[in-house]
């Protein structure tokens, strides 16, 4: 996609926006390197996975901890894998992981899943999937790779230490406990829902004239690459139409 935009003359600038003034006809974005002005802007800053919240998480990202099954499942072929979460995404990704891992254990802080009934039924019927109820991941560790995990039962207060099979050398831990919209400096400039996602209409307009939002950063029911691309196309067409009025 990057190369495609270059073919059409798009300019790419690497910068971090630290402030946004969106109330005027000309929108002003202040970055660490420069200041940018435009009559229209499209906010497409995405969303990122909510951290699992355990000690050692940062150290073992990419060394056993992942937040994307479709990206990393292949690395855990024939290994044991754990999934933190209990919603639709967690259970769907657990089901996907069973195509690669020899065993998948869902760790959920409640005593029942929050996923849709149809998805739950598939998980309960899958012989590769096990469950750790009323539990949260407290700490992870290892010798360069994820090899040890401490899980706490929040009802009993009991701690369980889980270790990788010696012949495997590691296990996987996937976090699917929600996403956080990457609204940054735009959070208090446009209308958002109670989770921080930007509200738009079907044409990607926000409540601020000349400001659009596309992709995972906006309120929507399905967050996938295909829907983000569609959002971007719609927003771009709307910007083009608005500019043709001048």
Task: Go through each PLM region and give its residues.
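N-terminal Rossmann-fold NAD(P) dinucleotide-binding loop
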Residues: 90-91
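Generic hydrophobic/aromatic pocket-lining and core-packing "Φ" positions
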Residues: 94-95
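FAD-site-proximal beta/loop scaffold in flavoenzymes
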Residues: 48, 53, 59-77, 175-227, ...
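Aromatic/hydrophobic pocket-lining residues that form π-stacking "cages" and hydrophobic walls in ligand
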Residues: 1
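A Rossmann-like FAD-binding core segment of flavoenzymes
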Residues: 5-6, 11-30, 35-38, 99-202, ...
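Redox-cofactor binding/interface segments in oxidoreductases and associated redox assembly factors
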Residues: 37, 43-44, 83, 175
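Glycine-rich Rossmann-fold phosphate-binding loop(s) that bind the pyrophosphate
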Residues: 85-87
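Hydrophobic anchor at the start of a short beta-strand
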Residues: 41, 81, 104
